[in-house]
């Protein structure tokens, strides 16, 4: 989570959408360390700024407002991603980055745990602009310009903090038909409201 008091916007950070990379880019290029706030990430070495001890990582809207009531007057945005793609990203992150699941756990076994990055409860109360990960860079150019600064796409691409964690194969190749439906049910709101579909390339 990042609050720019200097530019009056809030980024509600969701999982598996490049949120830590975006935080790090903003901190390095468009951040006032004296007044802006960020929960940071110990996993990705993104620094923490100007928040109470224990305020880390992914934070929901009501907690953000309690910490800084001024945010109700700010622009608010978040990022979402195709749920089926997002779950594949979570699987490789848990298995290969932080060791939360065994190395020999298959993707289908992981899907059946339903330990998914469902994040809408973090942001819906804030009524944010929801940027789709699939065209995030173009949308961030427009959003940042509206906030008074330029988003440098090429520079941002150098901040890919979790690159190399997953195979380059299309996400659909990981799925069985049963897996598809489990994820569809878990992300029903995102699929219906953000118009996501399972793109089958199996």
For each feature predicted by the language model, list its residue ranges:
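Membrane-interface amphipathic segments in extracytoplasmic regions
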Residues: 1-202
């Amino acid at each position: 989570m990042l609050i720019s008091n200097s530019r009056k916007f809030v980024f509600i950070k969701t999982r598996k959408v490049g949120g830590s990379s975006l935080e790090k880019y903003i901190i390095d290029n468009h951040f006032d360390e004296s007044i802006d706030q960020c929960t940071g990430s110990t996993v990705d070495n993104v620094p923490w700024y100007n928040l109470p001890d224990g305020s880390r990582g992914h934070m929901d809207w009501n907690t953000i407002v309690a910490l800084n009531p001024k945010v109700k007057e700010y622009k608010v945005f978040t990022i979402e991603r195709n749920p089926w793609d997002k779950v594949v990203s979570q699987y490789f992150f848990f298995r290969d980055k932080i060791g939360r699941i065994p190395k020999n756990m298959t993707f289908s076994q992981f899907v059946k745990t339903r330990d998914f990055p469902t994040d809408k409860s973090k942001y819906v109360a804030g009524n944010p602009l929801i940027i789709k990960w699939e065209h995030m860079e173009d949308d961030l150019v427009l959003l940042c310009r509206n906030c008074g600064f330029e988003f440098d796409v090429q520079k941002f691409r150098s901040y890919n903090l979790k690159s190399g964690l997953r195979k380059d194969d299309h996400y659909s190749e990981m799925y069985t038909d049963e897996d598809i439906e489990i994820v569809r049910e878990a992300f029903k709101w995102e699929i219906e409201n953000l118009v996501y579909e399972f793109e089958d390339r199996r």
